[in-house]
Amino acid sequence: MKTTTGLIRRIDELGRVVIPKEIRRSMRLKDGEEVEISLGSEELILKKYSRVSSLKSLCDNCANSLSKVLGAEVFITDTSKVVSSFKNIENENKNLTHRFIEFLQKRERAINKGEDCLSMFIGQEKGKEQLILPLVVNGDLYGSIVVQADEIKTQHEKATQTALYILVGQLEN
């Protein structure tokens, strides 16, 4: 049943509520994904939850530091959107492209050059080279760190790997 304020659903005997497929699709909710449940006055609020987004200030600091040290554009993502972007703050909260999400699902690191660089979101300016490191904790994918520069060098990989270890350490706790 649909009302002017939303949908009406029954709670089953186990306390479950079905979220319609259209809503799951538009919010990019996948099977097994976490949602945050909060209570208001006479309301129950479901909110998409991202462990990476919950570490926003740490992600901002990591992206800022990496960008300054490497002189490159740095993005930190969760599995559906950009969480931190130092050089272009307007890129934050942009949805990731399906192609980029599919690549992340492989849980592989990559260095892409030229035309092989993946667009993370619609309208993104591609760098000449791109380093992608997935954020994986206990086998679960939580996001990625992406560095775009004119040339990816060993120092880019090592510094980004260090930032990755810091974020993974926080996500494990």
Predicted region positions:
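Intrinsically disordered, low-complexity terminal regulatory regions
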Residues: 8-84
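A short beta-strand signature within small-molecule sensing/ligand-binding domains used
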Residues: 125-134
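Short, solvent-exposed cationic patches
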Residues: 41-42, 102-116, 163-172
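Juxtadomain coupling helices with adjacent low-complexity linkers
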Residues: 56, 60-65, 146-173
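Structured interaction and signal-relay segments at domain junctions
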Residues: 63-122
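A detector for short, charged/polar N-terminal pre-domain segments
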Residues: 1-8
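Short hydrophobic/glycine-rich mini-motifs in sensory/regulatory modules
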Residues: 135-145
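A generic structural motif
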Residues: 24, 89-90, 148
